[in-house]
UniProtKB/Swiss-Prot annotation:
InterPro entries: SQ_cyclase_C (IPR032696), SQ_cyclase_N (IPR032697), Squalene_cyclase (IPR018333), Terpene_synthase_CS (IPR002365), Terpenoid_cyclase/PrenylTrfase (IPR008930)
Pfam families assigned to the protein according to its UniProt record, in alphabetical order: SQHop_cyclase_C, SQHop_cyclase_N
Name this polypeptide is given: Pre-alpha-onocerin synthase LCC
GO molecular function term, any single one: intramolecular transferase activity
Keywords linked to the UniProt accession: Isomerase, Repeat
Top EC class for this record: isomerase
Native organism taxonomy: Eukaryota, Viridiplantae, Streptophyta, Embryophyta, Tracheophyta
Source species, domain of life: Eukaryota
EC number: 5.4.99.65
Length: 756
């Protein structure tokens, strides 16, 4: 039986805080009672049966374990509201109490709330390909792991036989080829799978032009595996790191994720690495192409991309640059004396890789970077200590649910969901009942704050300050993010206002000042705040490096969400520490406020980049402006945003937004006009912050009715459509958002409606 292990290490792992936040799924053959096994199998069978209607898993395996460990207590009787006019404070309070008890019961012993953070279908295949070519697949992944990965891939196959970019999207060549290849590497035969699953996948591939039409990132990984030729891959010369730093096209000017994904890819490309050509690799060459492998025109294949995968058109200048590099510079760099330049470039890249690894404990900033860097270490030396240390961190990225095992978008979202969850608990204003929960959460938040800048030459390696910030997941991950830092600061200040005996030790003033320093360092000249680092390049550089599949991969722009979080944190800080960097903080708030107003769309909405989508953007846009001192009556931006939200409210009283809003940049309702708990909660929070209760509370009552009636018998909330997003087309899972935001919205509703 599978067990989730929290805050446990293993020999060879470096850590800064005793592995606090680390979450690892381990298979224990003899663990569990027959009843527990039956519960797990029932959850798996139910998901598989309903997989085409309900794509999101509900983290049932994790919840079964934690509810038992934390001795989940009986709940008050569940209230139901027939009409919004019948809402009483008692109904709201009872719903909150039930939700809080459930939420407390799924908190880990180190204070964070674990949860699924996957959703992207191309991550697990990259890991499996890397482990296969390095010969580590069966060493790192037991048969139990491999079986759960097979379960995951089959569960998320579309009815047409293909796989989408995320668990809800239409089938794409990228993820259909990747999933098919991965299943073959996981020892599935070409005719295996229920109802001919493998055959239907292969048929989808061939009917849509074959793997020759996979987008560029797919071509790269297939070349690594040996089922694509490097001559059919866009050039990624490591020499680009020798360009003058001031050039906008220098990759050091890219956003941190793009930079640290491209870095190892240039090394792998420069080495033209190909894994062992096994009988399975040879078989795949004959299975996924519509013509014989040896007759493929690889030069022509280099620019091909299936229409299902082409979210964005690549500009002519990019095609011209790639063609020039392929035909002119690459031949020079592969032969003497140009090969000496390549040798130096490869040495520089691998040195940078080792520097990053040592400073960030071999966790990696994200899954694609992690896997690519791990492969680089093996290419340099298969027996290296670096590669061995990377293998020890693979399981940090794996998550298990009733739909199977998958690779997550980070090594988790522990810090993010913990600070959001803590704010939700505080919003309920039932502190006496949440004492233990708040103590544990503060302990996690305190131990996760970054306390050092690392041993890095910030200019040479394109780094910024880290000390005082908070990461998305764990301290060992170590990358500070503006909104995680801002929300962490907000929570630290809010907890400090509670009685000392309730939460125990508090975060020091010096650490709070360090956090403010990190936040202020991330404000761009346009007044907005980036996520990881300042915006360095120009928008035209984005076009030059455009991917067919992903949006905004080059520049870390200013975002409405990050800007709003930073405004709210700085305002809260300024109220308590009135003299610390006073003028600088006031200027930062005013500039960020103007930025939020400047990027509002004509219809009154804001595009939410980090979640789906316009409801998320509206919540941050409104709350940021309100925190800065704006009001509905004096701010046209707030009025327009409220009008926008109210225009999208469904007849049921809720809101429900499709992930297509993120892809198409246009508000799209869920199918059949369904309401979504999370979108309803975000919209309710935004309207409450704007003062809607004083103007017309009816829309609020209707939304609150949805949240009350959606609660499940055990105090949980249902998993619905996917809510996380990045790069416009990449949707990610946050299974705890339904709990967190339902609690926060009902807590604020209760306060504004019954206690104002």
């Amino acid at each position: 039986m599978w067990k989730l292990k929290i805050a446990e290490g293993s020999p060879g792992l470096d850590t800064l805080n005793d592995h606090v936040g680390r979450q690892i799924w381990c298979y224990e053959k003899d663990a569990g009672t027959p009843e527990e096994h039956a519960e797990v199998e029932e959850a798996r069978a139910k998901f598989t049966e309903q997989r085409h209607e309900q794509r999101q898993s509900a983290d049932i395996l994790m919840k079964l374990q934690l509810l038992k460990e934390n001795s989940f207590s009986p709940l008050p009787t569940q209230p139901k509201v027939d009409r919004f006019e019948d809402i009483t404070e008692d109904a709201v309070q009872t719903t909150l109490r039930r939700a809080l008890r459930f939420f407390a019961a799924i908190q880990a012993h180190d204070g964070h709330w674990p949860g699924d953070h996957a959703g992207l279908m191309f991550l697990t295949p990259c890991l499996v390909i890397c482990l296969y070519v390095t010969g580590a697949l069966n060493t790192v992944l037991s048969e139990a792991h491999r079986q759960e990965m097979r379960r995951y891939l089959y569960n998320h196959q579309n009815k047409d036989g293909g796989w989408g970019l995320n668990i809800e999207s239409h089938s794409t060549m990228f993820c259909t080829v990747f999933s098919y290849v991965t299943l073959r590497l996981l020892e599935e035969g070409p005719h295996d799978g229920d109802e001919g699953a493998m055959e239907s996948a292969r048929l989808w591939i061939l009917d849509h032009g074959g793997a020759i039409a996979i987008p560029s990132w797919g071509k790269f990984w297939l070349a690594v595996l040996g089922v694509f030729e490097w001559s059919g891959v866009h050039p990624m010369p490591p020499e680009i790191w020798f360009l003058p730093h001031f050039l906008p096209i220098h990759p050091g000017q890219m956003n941190i994720h793009g930079k640290l994904i491209l870095l190892p890819m240039t090394y792998i490309y420069g080495r033209q690495f190909v894994g062992p050509i096994t009988s399975l690799v040879k078989a795949l060459r004959g299975e996924i192409f519509s013509t014989h492998y040896n007759t493929i025109d690889w030069q022509e294949a280099r620019t091909m991309c299936a229409k299902e995968d082409r979210y964005y058109s690549t500009p002519f200048v990019q095609d011209l640059a790639f063609t020039f590099a392929k035909q002119c510079t690459e031949p020079l760099l592969r032969s003497w004396p140009g090969s000496l330049v390549r040798k130096k470039a490869l040495e520089r890249v691998i040195k940078w890789i080792h520097t990053e690894d040592k400073n960030f404990r071999y966790v990696g900033i994200g899954p694609l970077s992690k896997v690519s860097v791990m492969l680089c270490c093996w290419i340099e030396d298969p027996n290296s200590e670096a590669f061995k240390r990377h293998l020890l961190r693979v399981h940090d990225y794996l998550w298990l649910a009733e739909d199977g095992m998958k690779m997550q978008g980070y090594n988790g979202c522990q810090m993010w969901e913990t600070v959001l969850g803590t704010q939700a608990v505080l919003s309920a204003r039932m502190h006496d009942e949440c004492n233990s929960m708040l103590r544990k959460a503060e302990d996690y938040i305190s131990k996760t704050q970054i306390q050092e800048d690392g041993n890095l030459d910030t200019k040479l390696w394109y780094h910024k300050i880290s000390k005082g910030g908070w990461p998305h997941s764990t301290r060992d991950h170590g990358w500070p993010i503006s909104d995680c830092s801002a929300e962490g600061l907000k929570v630290a200040l809010a907890l400090a206002d509670l009685p000392w005996a309730m939460t125990g030790s508090q975060i020091s003033e010096e650490n709070l000042f360090d956090c403010v320093n990190v936040i202020l360092s991330l404000q761009n000249p346009d007044g907005g705040f980036s996520a990881f680092e300042l915006k360095r390049a120009y928008p035209w550089a984005e076009k030059l490096l455009q991917s067919e599949t992903f949006g905004d991969i080059t520049i870390d722009y200013s975002w409405v969400e990050c800007s709003s979080s930073c405004i709210q944190a700085l305002v809260a800080f300024k109220k308590k520490y009135t003299t610390h960097r006073k003028e600088e903080i006031c200027r930062a708030i005013n500039r960020a406020c103007r930025f939020i107003e400047s990027i509002q769309r004509k219809d009154g909405s804001w595009y939410g980049y980090w979640a789906v989508c316009f409801t998320y953007g509206a919540w941050f846009g409104i709350t940021g402006l309100v925190a800065a001192g704006k009001s509905f009556h004096e701010s046209e931006a707030i009025r327009r945003a409220c009008d926008f939200l109210l225009s999208k409210q469904l007849p049921s009283g809720g809101w429900g937004e499709s992930y297509l809003s993120s892809e198409n940049e246009e508000y799209t309702h869920l199918k059949h006009g369904r309401a979504h708990v999370v979108h309803t909660a975000w919209s309710l929070l935004a309207l409450l912050a704007s003062g809607q209760a004083e103007r017309d509370p009816v829309p609020l009552h209707r939304a609150a009715t949805i949240l009350i009636n959606s609660q499940l018998e055990n105090g949980d909330y249902p998993q619905q459509e996917i809510v996380g997003a990045i790069h416009k087309t990449c949707m990610t899972t946050y299974t705890l958002f339904c709990n967190i935001f339902a609690i926060q919205a009902l807590g604020e509703y209760r306060q504004k409606i019954f206690h104002s």
